[in-house]
Amino acid sequence: MRTNPTTSRPGVSTSEEKSTGRIDQIIGPVLDVTFPPGKLPYIYNALVVQSRDTADKQINVTCEVQQLLGNNRVRAVAMSATDGLMRGMEVIDTGAPLSVPVGGATLGRIFNVLGEPVDNLGPVDSSATFPIHRSAPAFIELDTKLSIFETGIKVVDLLAPYRRGGKIGLFGGAGVGKTVLIMELINNIAKAHGGVSVFGGVGERTREGNDLYMEMKESGVINEKNIEESKVALVYGQMNEPPGARMRVGLTALTMAEYFRDVNKQDVLLFIDNIFRFVQAGSEVSALLGRMPSAVGYQPTLSTEMGSLQERIASTKKGSITSIQAVYVPADDLTDPAPATTFAHLDATTVLSRGLASKGIYPAVDPLDSTSTMLQPRIVGNEHYETAQRVKETLQRYKELQDIIAILGLDELSEEDRLTVARARKIERFLSQPFFVAEVFTGSPGKYVALAETIRGFQLILSGELDGLPEQAFYLVGNIDEASTKAITLEEENKSQK
């Protein structure tokens, strides 16, 4: 196999003398192209078809070389619709892989898989481009220190902390606050870490992508008046795109994130929604290329494809890429090869609960189902670990007692269990938090809570020092001092009403 030399040299796209071939065969989004002897393109090279169709409309299709078939023929996958293409049309080898714009000029903009802006705001003013196929950072460049990535969100930082440069799976259905949580994380990384975010919509519904863009503009994550002050770049490959585009859009987003990490030396947050669609697109392409399917009809190269994407998401000595990936689980089967392969790469899982959302507790992160490999005494320290374990024990006991409470009522519980229930309800409410990006909807100012403050707050609840405060005082507040202040306000309101 001829591999592309540009993929091993980050940021370099050396273009040789461009050779031209002819389309030999078209099967859906897959093209077979014949080149002159000795002029074959490398694997992953971008090919361009520029012509006119029978209605004299301009055709501009970019493809990526996937296989060398022999007899001077290559098989390529199109990144856009192949409508209007015909056998015999001229195909130009660009001599390099797909390259996309990178840097500060990408912030606040929406791109497609080719790095072309699709937001009708004109061309991108960026001279720097990176090829989307790049090697993972060398082992000696990696930052192997285990450090917590503080998000300022109490429930995440205490019970399922994120690893700096780690990978987090975000599990949640429709309407439980996934988008708001994503936007808050984008906002907090910009304010607390001076970082930026890249959002990769892989197999997204176009409507959802549009809604996210509009909500980001409303909340100030994207600054319309001064686009350079935006905190996020968006890359979309929607559901209606050919499988080639959906398979590569994740790499486009990752390439933009790598520039911020390696060149700007920033902490970057990379969102991929949905990582399952990346696998699904790879499965479609694999079948189109004639590969024998593997387990459950997935591509035989499933682990390799997932690994090549995930290994590039890492912390180096220059900066970090922390990735949050929405994971769709087909038919709720966690043993399905797609989610099972993803789980092998995750450091933490954040599970959003419809039950908590229906109670009005936001963020609706399930404190018992969410997990993290970082929650170990040697990493987070004994104080943090013990507080988190006691919080989980209290909530678990409350969960066990709920059936008894529903049938017999609170009065039938022992004194100790009644105290556990009261504290668990306070903990549940204290895990809620007003978000900066939701200020326009709630009217409450957003709160960023430092990890030390979070631990102190839960320790005070568990110790019983705050047993006298009403549970409403803990709902939608930042640190524990605000809960005490809110309790005094509630008491004064009750007195004035009497």
From Swiss-Prot:
Residues 1-14 have a biased composition (Polar residues). Its EC number is 7.1.2.2. InterPro entries: AAA+_ATPase, ATP-synt_VA_C, ATP_synth_F1_bsu, ATPase_a/bsu_AS, ATPase_alpha/beta_chains, ATPase_F1/V1/A1_a/bsu_N, ATPase_F1/V1/A1_a/bsu_N_sf, ATPase_F1/V1/A1_a/bsu_nucl-bd. ATP binds at G172, G173, A174, G175, V176, G177, K178, T179. One of its GO terms (biological process) is proton motive force-driven mitochondrial ATP synthesis. It holds the Pfam family ATP-synt_ab. Its main location: plastid. Produces ATP from ADP in the presence of a proton gradient across the membrane. The catalytic sites are hosted primarily by the beta subunits. Belongs to the ATPase alpha/beta chains family. F-type ATPases have 2 components, CF(1) - the catalytic core - and CF(0) - the membrane proton channel. CF(1) has five subunits: alpha(3), beta(3), gamma(1), delta(1), epsilon(1). CF(0) has four main subunits: a(1), b(1), b'(1) and c(9-12). This is ATP synthase subunit beta, chloroplastic.
